[in-house]
Amino acid sequence: MGIRFGVQEEHSFAANLAWAEKQAAVQVKSAANALEASQHVLSYLEALWSIEKDHLHIAVDVSSFPRTSLVAIYSAIWASARASRPISVSFLYSFAQFTEPPIDHGPITEFGAVSPEFSGIGEADFGLATLIGLGYESELALAAQQVMDPALTWLAVPQSLDVRFDDAVRKANDLLINIVDERNVWSFPVDDPYSTFVELEMISHGLQRTHNVVLVPLGPKLLVVACLLVSSIHRNVGVWRVSPGGLREPREQLAAGPVAYISAIFSGTH
């Protein structure tokens, strides 16, 4: 199933849509928002359950999803899973060719939990610890740090297959990197999402003993998935977003070739 969101349908979208509609095995569904996308996924999964009674294995390509829709689709899969009918999910990400950072990311219009179920559960006597993923959007990362004003700040710096991307991200976020304790600047491998998840879970597990923890996954989409997985395990850990919403100017992205993925089993609890 492919989901069409009806916004920012520019650049190579028409060619991609034409290809998908020619594939007999692909159902193209239109979704006006993240809720409709999640409803399409729930219906799709229920149809699969009518065929496979015990266990599903699905793949979700997160490369082009808006983050709000990614969260909604993740939640829909979680809602469909049961202990008696688990769902194995592989989240895939196709790396894009390097492009220079955009000059303007647009004004910030959205800030808060990615959805109510990922808002986190705070302890009244704990301070706030925030882990912010870094990407090209340096002003969004700075805004998250300044608005949340945490007692402790961690930064997640992506290490990609292209050193030009790494250099551009560090250059864009130089101010924030320099004001955060270097011991709290964590580099994670974009091409190894399982290791990223394991390390993120360890960091979050340690922080939650003394702090209310909020993860803000700017940067690569697989970091969003890792944060959602961690929050699904540690329900007191929140996942928040800061975004210009639909005001960001769309850009053409070409696949570089490599694909990374992380797999998890959803059973209605974790």
Positions of the model-derived regions?
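Redox- and metal-dependent alpha/beta enzyme cores, enriched for Fe-S-associated oxidoreductases
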Residues: 134-203
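Short, flexible loop segments at boundaries between secondary-structure elements
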Residues: 85-102, 235-267
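Active-site histidine-anchored catalytic micro-motif
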Residues: 65-70, 85-116
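A short, acidic, amphipathic alpha-helical segment used as a generic capping/interface helix at domain edges
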Residues: 45-49, 192-211, 223-231
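An N-terminal, globular interaction/scaffold subdomain
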Residues: 1-47
